Amino acid sequence: MSNRTTGPGVTAAESTPSWEPRPTPPSGAPNVVVVVLDDTGFSHLGCFGSDIETPNIDRLAAGGLRYTNFHTTALCSPTRACLLSGRNHHSVGMRWLSNLDTGFSNCRGVISKSAATLPEVLRENGYGTFAVGKWHLANLEDCSPAGPFDHWPLQ
């Protein structure tokens, strides 16, 4: 019997992969849920003192982190680019809306490939990521109902 450390074995139990193991989050790592609501302010959510009852959002806020100091433009694409990258929307190329390329490096209408996004950083650390809804961060010619879903439509 050989002393191989990787490679095929007689059975699956005896085989070991020759590739690096996929990263996994540390034990006890938190779940990360980001909720983006258009046209919503502090005065609309119960967890920020509103008279409007929002029990499910209040419950999420009570058990997690609440960010209370986020400043950006009122346009959807730049706001989402800031949220996903943690950087100013000008510095990641999303000065206006997606699909509006002015030719200037800070206004290409897409998030720069050099700007890491929260989902990318989480994936590198073993998290599974999922996004749903209208993000408005990709050029229409880069989007298709067939995907690719590992980066569509965020970049």
Which sequence ranges carry the predicted segments?
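Formylglycine-dependent sulfatase
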Residues: M1-Q155
